[in-house]
Swiss-Prot record:
Organism listed in the record: Arabidopsis thaliana
UniProt feature, compositional bias: Low complexity: 986-1004
Polar residues compositional bias, start-end: 323-335, 363-378
Keyword match Transit peptide: no
Renumbered residue ranges of the record's region Disordered: 295-378, 393-470, 576-645, 745-827, 952-1077
BRCT domain: residues covered: 7-97, 104-194, 1090-1181
Residue ranges crossing the lipid bilayer per the database entry: none
InterPro entries cross-referenced by the UniProt entry: At4g02110-like (IPR044254), BRCT_dom (IPR001357), BRCT_dom_sf (IPR036420)
Annotated PROSITE patterns: BRCT
UniProt feature, compositional bias: Basic and acidic residues: 410-422, 600-611, 818-827, 971-983, 1024-1047
Keyword set, alphabetical order: Repeat
Protein name as it appears in the record: BRCT domain-containing protein At4g02110
Keyword Protein biosynthesis attributed: no
Comp. bias intervals (Basic residues): 793-802
Lineage: Eukaryota, Viridiplantae, Streptophyta, Embryophyta, Tracheophyta
Length: 1329
């Protein structure tokens, strides 16, 4: 269980710290984090402390020198903050946490202006931090006359091309920064004029000569080439008689073949952003891999040595470069199904996962450390069960306990040694890979496999892992020909079986293949692998039949060339050799290089491996994620719902759940009409589906993107077969609402914080009524004399229930709202499923109301603005419910009356409303969605009202109660059922005769009195008194019914496009048809979106330097605001963007497109002084003219915010585009997030585009330099789709009002103007979500 801050309880366990040099405020902040995480404050620096944490002290300060000499850890305060962020102790040896040698920076660094290109994620932030530590300046844009150094990962892109033409700009890789900081001087750039990508290729192709072929190298996995985060190990040096330097050759075993090749880019002609496609035919995926995950070097960690009979020395510069891990934005791919790829597991084993619906591969890198040193382990797992799992080196399954190769016996001083003796040793597990059978070269492919022992013989702690008994049994006389494996990040093993092996047996049972390889001492020419008694070994391993036959055949097939994920299903044949990319280095395996060995297979049932739940060690590119965040929540995959880890939000097949955030006493009720077995099955299903999503950021949990919440809350499956012998009438007559609900027999339950509910069971008639209500301010349903008081914000509500008659209820309520109080603006998520009694309620503040209609009971309670009138004629079996809402006593001399009458599918509704003269106060209503065909009703947005009802009969009535009343009527064999469900935002009252309630909202007080009533039904009059200038009631209810598709979309404030998952088959129409089918209360209505100052959370995203961001985030949290995950990427839940200056960044682009508040930093400072979050408008970035660089029209932030307030949608609402070619500025990921934030849609990012060659596609975004005669360009032109550059959209958002013609390609200006006009019309379109 984690705290609200996301910090595990014992992050700093064992840390005895002393703080030196801090100011009181900063020191107290760090001390609080340390103590809360289990650290112990020892006060002054003494020998008892383990960590000396300093600020503004130099590296050579006497206290720092004394601490280092005594073996203490000396770090800066950043180490505490970063460890706090990731939930575990960060690497204290990182250069980022080392005290400076001079507070003024490295001599001569003041003139440095550094820019970067090719790095992503937290790599960028750490490079910026290193520049800051050096004393230089960092510039995000490459300003030709200012920038002095460009840090390149790859020598490509616009920045590189510009820098190459300007001789004064030095092109270096990031290791230059690191080495400068280590040596505290500016080093010559000539040694670093090689890109990170070229270093990758160099290392991947580096092989030792045949003389050193038996020397196995240990390349530290999962570490950073920048030497910043995870345990650092310097370059490997091998001494050779004569001391001559020799170059790395192809075939050398010094470098880790498998890791390098596994990350080798497949192609270089397109960036990785362009490899994402939503097209079903080209489900290309991408994954971002940080270069920091593989090699990290710091002198403190010691030196990895490899000793041969002699001693050999490698050129340190080459080796240093070659240790750089592969880091490519262009190749690694992410699965759109789960979007969990590339995220580290929450453990010391950080794994890079590739997910496909078929085979899954997981490469886990283990770093285990002991006092004697640290060792690196890596295992390769291949899974096909649709689950993502990790295999920890310490936690191999019982079936193979000896698979723990090393146990921390690598000495930091002596490091890893491989000796030429009679006892063979295992190469590092990082070389374990499935391999391909190559019978054409038996001399290279056949290798002896001997007993497995510990490869390390450390002088300090030279203990050995026990020799595996199982592996001894596995050694036999059978020949196992193998060849080296090449693996790429975008490729998964495929075609691993032979024709005679059934496909099913391999794909279902060969769930894990761990290739254990061991070298045999002696001649490298000896290439026969013997495996004894494979049948017995297979029996002990509980192998599947096909796997046993595979072993019995005497040959284990391996495959080196790997298939892409979309093709990575085991086809049961090795009948084709996958084509190799030009950039895949062709490796020749030396006779004793790592890679061969035995396959261990497990049965299907044993794929669940125990793993430790710990946060990953930090590395560049991975820092700052407390858990596994969902990257790119704004998935462009239209056919796939966004992932979530909120299992309690999903309702399927009898599962009833209702999360109400902010309330710890959440309860989950399964109604008796539900099938408990189905509930269990669904729970298991959800567990499986969300296994990789357990650690989503807490802010993301609470407020996901609107489209995502739409899928989460509304994944409702109609379960008619499970209604257990209920007649259609009974099924239709019973509606269950479950929020914080328990089964009670005439016993009321009160919950002052989130509401109360009462459940009644009539045992005599076997009828059940269930009512649930959750109100933002209060909700009371109770027995005689029960009362409570609840405070929400400044509102205080006291309600008293006095008495009640079973069949007679009359309610008369009056509600007064202050003009300055917007408490009635927020809407909540509410879902009612009529057919099988399921309810899901999601969101920060859920408001749920409903009732159970029984067949013979005439009394009911209805929590609503207006109580409902229920008349039951038991003789005729008719049931009718009518609702009338009357708003009177308006503080204005004129009254507007409106009657709305519509026919939908043969249903009539009459609604009479008296309204305020202020049109807005009664015109704009909230969407209520009714899915008549599939029983699915959905709501978009963090706060919205959803009423779901499944009608079993053909006749269904959906009526537009434009003033907060909805009436549904249907006739089923003389059984008429009317239902009204209305929710009152500020207070909900459903009480008994004579009950009274006093509500105070702001300074206004309201007296509610319940009076008796004649007859057997309920009659209600709800009187609402409002200030004339009050905007709090401007959001009411609006019903949009799409009869063509039997689907009604209801959207919240954050998203205009509602996409729902329909359980039953339903007719679907085009988007234009759906839009044209929307019904509006008033064609003149203009939607106004107001944030509820008291109740609706504000989500802030901050820009600027890290220290400033951290400070602002702390202030915002103290003022009860919420902060989005700290990242340079846009977060969809953000409502406010705090920017110290306006620049054309992703955050600004997405914030403007979404219509969010873009505020100056003064807003935070003044809010801090005021002790509360102030009104935003005085602090909004808004002016006339352009910004200093001419990239932004200063009127754009306010323009698009007003568009959202007026219409409810973003700047790109309804936009449908395809992307063709490379997207560099902005990158594709940025473009996707911004377009999604602006409520647009990217249809596809790679060919084929056949499905989208129609008039509904507004633009085709083309990469610069694409020739006109390209086949797809011709297709776009033939279908009159305008072709534009990506800057067209950027400037449309950032520079509204300025000409865009210069960004139009191939003379498609007339078509572009037509699409532009469509966007302008949509901008004025009032959309009701």
């Amino acid at each position: 269980m984690q705290s609200d801050s996301g910090l595990p309880p014992k992050t700093y366990s064992g840390v005895k710290f002393a703080l030196v040099g801090f100011n009181p405020i900063h020191g107290n902040s760090l001390r609080s984090k340390l103590v809360s995480g289990g650290g112990v404050d020892v006060g002054q620096f003494t020998q008892s402390c383990t960590h000396l944490i300093v600020d503004k002290l130099l590296y050579d300060d006497p206290i720092c020198v004394a601490a280092r000499n005594s073996g203490k850890v000396v770090v800066t305060g950043s180490w505490v903050d970063h460890s706090f962020d990731i939930g575990m102790l960060d690497n204290a040896n990182s250069i980022l946490y080392r005290p400076l040698r001079d507070l003024n920076g490295i001599p001569g660094s003041k003139a440095l202006v550094v820019c970067l290109t090719g790095y992503q994620g937290h790599d960028r932030e750490d490079i910026m931090r290193m520049v800051e530590l050096m004393g230089g300046q960092f510039s995000k844009p490459l300003v030709a006359n200012r920038v002095t150094h460009l840090i390149c990962y790859k020598f490509e892109g616009e920045k590189y091309e510009l820098a190459k033409r300007i001789k004064r700009i030095k092109l270096v890789n990031h290791r230059w920064l690191e080495d400068c900081l280590k040596n505290w001087k500016l080093l010559p750039e000539v040694d670093y004029e090689i890109s990170g990508y070229e270093l990758d290729i160099m290392e991947a192709s580096a092989r030792d000569s045949e003389d050193e072929a038996e020397d196995a190298s240990v390349k530290p996995a999962n570490t950073s080439p920048l030497g910043l985060r995870v345990g650092a190990v310097p370059a490997v040096e091998i001494s050779k008689p004569g001391g001559k330097d020799f170059p790395l050759e192809e075939g050398s075993s010094l470098c880790n073949t498998s890791k390098d090749n596994w990350l080798t880019p497949k192609r270089t002609d397109r960036p990785f952003e362009a490899m994402v496609s939503t097209d079903l035919g080209v489900a290309q995926q991408h994954n971002y891999v940080s270069p920091i995950r593989v090699a990290n070097k710091t002198p403190e960690q010691g030196m990895s040595k490899m000793e041969t009979d002699g001693s050999t020395s490698i050129n340190r510069s080459i080796r240093r470069h070659s240790s750089l891990a592969t880091y490519s934005r262009k190749t690694l791919q992410r699965s759109p199904e789960t979007d969990t790829l590339g995220k580290e597991s929450s453990g010391q084993n950080r794994s890079l996962r590739m997910d496909d619906k078929g085979l899954k591969a997981s490469s886990a890198f283990n770093t285990s450390a002991s006092k004697s040193g640290s060792s690196m382990e890596r295992t390769s797992l291949f899974r096909d069960l649709g689950k993502i799992d990790m295999l920890h080196g310490e936690e191999f399954p019982p079936m193979m306990p000896q698979a723990k190769f090393t146990d921390g016996s690598v000495s930091r001083k002596d490091s890893l040694r491989v000796h030429h003796n009679s006892e063979a040793s295992i190469p590092p597990p990082s070389s374990l890979l499935l391999q391909e059978l190559r019978p054409s070269s038996p001399n290279d492919n056949l290798r002896p496999v001997m007993s497995i022992s510990d490869p390390t013989e450390s002088e300090e702690a030279g203990h050995k892992s026990p020799t595996s008994e199982l592996n001894t049994k596995l050694l036999s006389s059978n020949v196992v020909p193998m060849v080296d494996a090449l693996s790429t990040a975008e490729n998964i093993i495929s075609n691993c079986a032979w024709d005679e092996i059934p496909e099913k047996s391999l794909t279902e049972r060969m769930t894990e293949n761990v290739l254990l390889q061991e070298q045999r001492s002696g001649s490298p020419k000896q290439n026969l692998s013997v495996v004894p008694n494979l049948r017995e070994a297979a029996h002990e391993l509980d192998l599947s039949d096909s796997a046993a036959r595979l072993f019995n055949s005497g040959v284990v097939p391996m495959e080196a060339d790997i298939r892409t994920p979309e093709n990575s299903t085991m086809k049961g044949a090795l009948d084709e050799v996958p084509e190799r990319s030009v950039t895949d280095p062709v490796m020749r395996r030396s006779s004793t290089s790592p890679g061969s060995g035995l396959i261990r297979m497990k049965d299907k049932q044993e794929t669940e491996l125990t793993t430790k739940k710990t946060a990953p060690k930090k590395s560049l590119g991975t820092r700052g994620r407390k858990k596994n965040p969902i990257n790119q929540k704004g998935s462009i995959y239209l056919s796939e719902p966004s992932p979530t880890d909120e299992r309690n939000v999903c309702l399927n097949k009898g599962k009833v759940s209702a999360p109400v955030t902010g309330n710890s006493n959440q309860k989950e009720i399964s109604s008796p009409v539900l099938n408990t077995e189905v509930v269990q099955d669904m729970a298991k299903h959800i567990d499986t589906e969300t296994e990789a999503l357990q650690g989503i950021d807490s802010v993301d949990n609470k407020s996901l993107a609107p489209e995502e919440k739409d899928h989460l809350v509304l994944d409702l499956m109609v379960n008619q077969d499970k209604l257990q012998a209920k007649t259609p009438e009974a099924a239709d007559a019973e509606v269950e609402i479950t929020v914080l609900e328990r089964e009670l027999n005439d016993v009321p339950t009160e919950d002052p914080s989130d509401g109360a509910l009462q459940s009644e069971v009539d045992k005599n008639t076997s009828k059940r009524k269930r009512e649930a209500g959750v109100g933002k301010n209060s909700l009371q349903r109770g027995k005689k004399g029960s009362s409570f008081t609840a405070k929400v914000g400044k509102s205080r509500v006291k309600k008293t229930k006095i008495s009640r008659k079973e069949n007679d209820i009359k309610a008369n309520g009056t509600l007064m709202k202050d003009g300055g109080d917007n408490s009635a603006d927020g809407k909540e998520n509410l879902a009612l499923e009529h057919e099988n009694g399921k309810v899901s309620s999601g969101g920060d503040q859920s408001l749920v109301a409903g009732e159970t209609l029984t067949r013979k009971e005439a009394a009911t309670k209805d929590p609503s603005y207006a109580a409902a009138q229920l008349e039951v004629d038991t003789k005729k079996g008719k049931r009718r419910k009518q609702a009338t809402v009357e708003e009177n006593r308006l503080q204005t001399p004129s009254v507007k009356k409106a009657k709305v009458s519509k026919k939908e599918d043969g249903a009539k509704a009459n609604n009479t409303v008296k309204k305020d003269i202020w049109i807005h106060s009664a015109e704009v209503k909230e969407n209520v969605a009714v899915d008549e065909n599939c029983g699915d009703v959905s709501s978009d947005g963090a706060q919205s009202l959803v009423v779901e009802k499944s009608l079993a009969k053909k006749e269904a009535a959906a009526k537009d109660p434009s003033n907060a009343a909805m009436q549904l009527e249907f006739d089923d064999n003389k059984c008429k059922h009317g239902k009204e469900g209305i929710v009152e935002r500020s207070s909900l009252q459903s009480g008994k005769k004579g009950s009274s309630s006093r509500v105070e909202v702001g300074k206004s007080s309201v007296k509610k009195t319940k009076k008796s009533e004649k007859g057997s039904g309920t009659e209600a009059t709800d009187t609402v008194m409002k200030d004339v200038g009050d905007n709090s009631a401007k959001e009411k209810e609006n019903i949009a019914v799409d009869n063509e598709s039997r689907k009604v979309g209801s959207g919240g404030d954050q998203s205009p496009v509602a996409r729902k998952k329909v359980a039953k088959s339903a007719k679907t129409g085009t988007k234009a048809e759906k839009e044209s089918k929307q019904l509006r209360v008033n064609p003149l209505a203009s939607r106004k979106v107001f944030q509820d100052q008291e109740h609706e959370p504000k989500f802030f995203i901050v820009s600027g330097p890290r220290s400033q961001r951290n400070e602002y985030q702390q202030i915002i949290r103290r003022l009860k605001g919420k902060c989005c995950r700290d990242s340079h990427q846009w977060s969809y839940q953000a409502t406010h963007f705090i920017a110290p200056e306006i620049r054309r960044t992703e955050k600004f682009f997405a914030a403007a497109a979404s219509g969010s508040w873009i505020l100056k930093t003064d807003y935070v400072a003044d809010s801090k002084e005021a002790g509360k979050l102030l009104q935003e408008e005085p602090y909004e970035w808004h002016s006339s003219g352009l910004s200093a660089d001419g990239a932004i029209n200063l009127e754009s932030p306010k323009k698009w915010r007003l568009v959202r307030e007026k219409t409810g949608h973003g700047a790109l609402y309804g936009l449908r585009i395809v992307v063709y070619g490379d997207c560099t500025i902005p990158c594709l990921d940025t473009l996707k997030r911004a377009v999604k934030a602006g409520d647009g849609t990217i249809l596809a990012t790679a060919p084929p585009y056949t499905r989208f060659l129609n008039q509904n596609t507004d633009f085709a975004l083309i990469s610069p330099g694409m020739p006109r005669d390209d086949v797809w360009i011709q297709e776009f032109i033939r279908h009159e789709i305008p072709c534009v550059l990506s800057d067209y959209l950027v400037e449309y958002v950032c520079k509204p009002g300025y000409a865009l013609d210069k960004h139009v390609l191939y003379n498609t200006n007339s078509w572009a103007e037509k699409s532009f006009n469509k966007m302008q019309l949509r901008a004025d379109l009032c959309v009701y979500h």
